[in-house]
Amino acid sequence: MSEVLSKYDYIIVGGGSAGAVLATRLSENPALDVLLLEAGSKDTNPLIHIPFGLSLLSRFEGIGWGYHTAPQKEMYDRELFWPRGKTLGGSSSVNAMCYIRGQKEDYDRWANEEGAEGWSFDDVLPYFKRSENFEEGADEYHGTGGPLNVSKLRHTSVLSDAFVNSASIAGYQQLDDFNRDDREGLGYYHVTQANGQRCSTAKGYLTQAKHRNNLTVLTRVAAEKVLLKEGRAIGVQVREKGVVNRYFAKSEVILCGGAINSPQLLMLSGIGPRAELEEKGIFVQQDLPGVGQNLQDHLDAIVQYTCKAREGYAVALGALPSYVKATADYAFRRKGIFSSNIAEAGGFVSSSLATQGPDIQFHFLPAILNDHGRQLAFGYGYGLHVCCLYPKSRGTISLQSNHPADQALIDPNYLTAEEDQQVMIEGVRIARKLLSAPDFDKFQGSELYPGVEAQTDEEILEFLRERAETIYHPIGTCKMGSNDDEMAVVDTQLRVRGIAGLRVVDASVMPSLIGGNTNAPTVMIAERAAEFIKATHEGQPVSLAKAESA
């Protein structure tokens, strides 16, 4: 074993959506030495930065973890593909760039019902605004001058236009911004793009910090365990280029690996449920039964149609001229088809079971999508993705073995709650209604999925069991909570319970799913954590009240 004796003030494990934010914010103080460790490579693949390139990213093993779930008992034992970003920027480098914060009630629920005191909407809004450069200008809900550029799309398909126009026919309103008080309706998504290019946290944050002498960024370095001494985190053991090395932290180790990797690393380090650790032959450093529990994710199903007009984004000979033009448009103006995130439009609606605002989200794609884009889907078409926003099903992340290279066992337990089934069934029915609006008359071909034969609840549920997939929003496996909640892994300052000098800062700390895409909230969490850490370092009291200057 080779020991790297360099000591840093802070070691951040994971250079993704949260880690890139933390590394940038903490290294603003030139007196602090910060080490950022990323298991993946640098974000040099050009398809990362071209928004339309996301349709191909899932085929590149080098920038994704390639995870699969355990067999899903309510889905015919299917082992679902679970893509997560493995590159600088993490999943913010491979996602669809939709900028969604969720509902006010989501954060108020965290604070008032789930033990996350100080994380109400009023508390977290300043950190959303701090991170943001909203191209339409600052106001009550949006900020400017932040590293994360948020813009309108530079290109939308006529099929997306038809979807948004279907709102009034179906009894919904058209909305210009889903990040305000009223968000029930349909519209176009704001996206994390700058000048027609993806604005990941690597691009928005790390780019401005990478030349700082006090920030070291190492890629292709796999963390194996947190080093502990007398109840304190003192460093990280890693494997780089086949060699095991150790890096040491003077102040804190901060895990930013996400809802799969962070609980796995905690357990490999001896922090987690005692029985599971002992079964895997791992010495128990801290018995925390909540590590790896409370896994939640948004399940997604596509109502898919063929298109009888040559519109949208097709794999077809007839589409070649449009792609030739698109190449020129993008190369010279950063506009046109290649600036599209494909999931251009969508919306939020309520099922009959909704209690506090919309519980269904839509993403409209003017294309035929098959197996997360890993398989070519020929021909013209379009689809509406249906997502249950507040699933009752709960899953787990557990260890397959005590070997760091072995994938964790991912079991989201999809559709085990009957209410989730009902919400998804209603969502499919609403999606069909929207796609049958008069604006689609000149486009609608045949229904590919679920298929016209699927009409009863039982038949639609059968379709869900056979075809539903993740829409990439896992959270909750290191949840924050109050001191009297034995299942809470971190406190409201994101410190791991019972271990000094160790925090978790990523989507795994969310107590429950927010009503929408999870990347923007993850960035907010990292912004908030940076303030906690700075205050602790400076010996200042940490306030959980909202930031005054943000």
Q: Can you annotate each of these PLM segments?
A:
Residues 1-550:
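N-terminal redox-cofactor-binding region of secreted/periplasmic oxidoreductases
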